[in-house]
């Protein structure tokens, strides 16, 4: 426990007094942190997160994330427990209240695991290098056939994931297009493999997308191939509007379980937050900011002969 004494500073005056105090106290507090050499830091407010240089993120928008800096490898971003007693709406339109107690407790438990060594979070660059080897991108119709044959011949107990990348969020728009269709499945060795099939691009000369879609549709229309997705109702509607295909064999939507677990917590249902909350050990937290690098890594894993095909 440490306290920073600042003489002549009235914390009740001026704009953003908390930030002003922290800015003045930062050198002292950072020196105390270096001296204590903690295994993990739990940051409860955005002011602390930013003024002490832990990260540039907002605690509200980035709750649950694990950041690092030059002197501490693990900084858990969470919310101050006081929000559980504040039944009011914050500036972002989100309701504070007792519903937040569970997610704050989850973040503290995550910090405890980090301190004990029970949780180790790889660097994002290392994680991307590792997982990029399990991502395959179709570059010809023959590869599309290979991908769909793999999916068709999985054991009957298998479940595949399905996701679309689209030109927008409105499937009824005249400009709505499906950019890629992506599938995931677990191999016999236990790895998760991702199969990506591009369907539209301004410079796409690899193959005719309509032919590729004919093979994809066979997978989507097969009720015996069990499918899951995150907010899969969007993919179902978009597919129906753009192609007329009504997806069969859907068994689960992972967003629904997040709605149950994080009931009442706005903006806590996306994949970005789910990665930090439930699979931080993969090191893929923050992946959405590194997608261009991931694409480059995947491309580098392909041989020149494969690309030329």
PLM regions: where:
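A polyanion-binding, active-site-adjacent surface
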Residues: 1-118
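Short, basic/hydrophobic alpha-helical segments
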Residues: 25-29, 33-37, 146-153, 207-224
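Acidic beta-strand-to-loop metal/phosphate-binding motif
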Residues: 37-45, 161, 224-232
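Short amphipathic alpha-helical segments
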Residues: 53-56, 173-174, 239-241
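Active-site-proximal helix-loop-helix substrate-binding element of RNase H-like nuclease domains
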Residues: 73, 82-85, 91, 115-139, ...
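Residue-level marker for buried hydrophobic side chains located in beta-strands
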Residues: 77, 160-162, 250
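N-terminal accessory regions of nucleic-acid-interacting proteins
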Residues: 100, 104-164, 168, 209-212
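A short alpha/beta connector and helix-capping loop motif
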Residues: 171-186
């Amino acid at each position: 426990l440490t306290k920073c004494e600042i003489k002549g500073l009235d914390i009740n005056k001026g704009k953003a007094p908390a930030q002003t105090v922290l800015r003045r106290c930062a050198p002292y507090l950072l020196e105390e942190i270096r001296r204590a050499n903690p295994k993990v830091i739990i940051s409860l407010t955005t002011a602390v997160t930013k003024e002490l240089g832990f990260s540039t993120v907002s605690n509200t928008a980035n709750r649950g994330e694990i950041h690092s800096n030059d002197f501490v490898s693990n900084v858990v971003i969470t919310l101050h427990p006081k929000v559980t007693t504040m039944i009011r709406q914050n500036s972002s339109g989100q309701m504070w209240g007792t519903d937040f107690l569970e997610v704050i407790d989850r973040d503290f438990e995550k910090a405890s695991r980090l301190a004990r060594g029970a949780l180790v979070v790889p660097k994002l660059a290392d994680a991307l290098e590792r997982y990029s080897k399990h991502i395959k991108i179709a570059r010809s119709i023959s590869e599309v056939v290979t991908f769909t044959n793999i999916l068709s011949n999985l054991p009957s107990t298998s479940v595949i994931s399905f996701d679309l990348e689209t030109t927008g969020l409105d499937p009824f728009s005249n400009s709505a297009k499906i950019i890629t269709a992506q599938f995931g499945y677990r191999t016999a060795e236990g790895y998760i493999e991702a199969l990506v099939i591009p369907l539209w691009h301004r410079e796409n000369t690899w193959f005719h997308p309509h032919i590729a879609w004919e093979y994809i549709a066979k997978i989507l229309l097969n009720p015996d191939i069990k499918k899951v997705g995150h907010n899969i109702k969007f993919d179902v509607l978009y597919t129906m509007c753009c192609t007329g295909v009504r997806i069969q064999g859907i068994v689960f939507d992972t967003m629904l379980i997040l709605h149950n677990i994080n009931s009442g917590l706005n903006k806590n249902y996306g994949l970005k937050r789910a990665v930090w909350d439930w699979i931080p050990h993969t090191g893929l937290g923050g992946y959405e900011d590194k997608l261009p690098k991931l694409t480059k890594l995947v491309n580098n894993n392909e041989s020149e002969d494969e690309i030329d095909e």
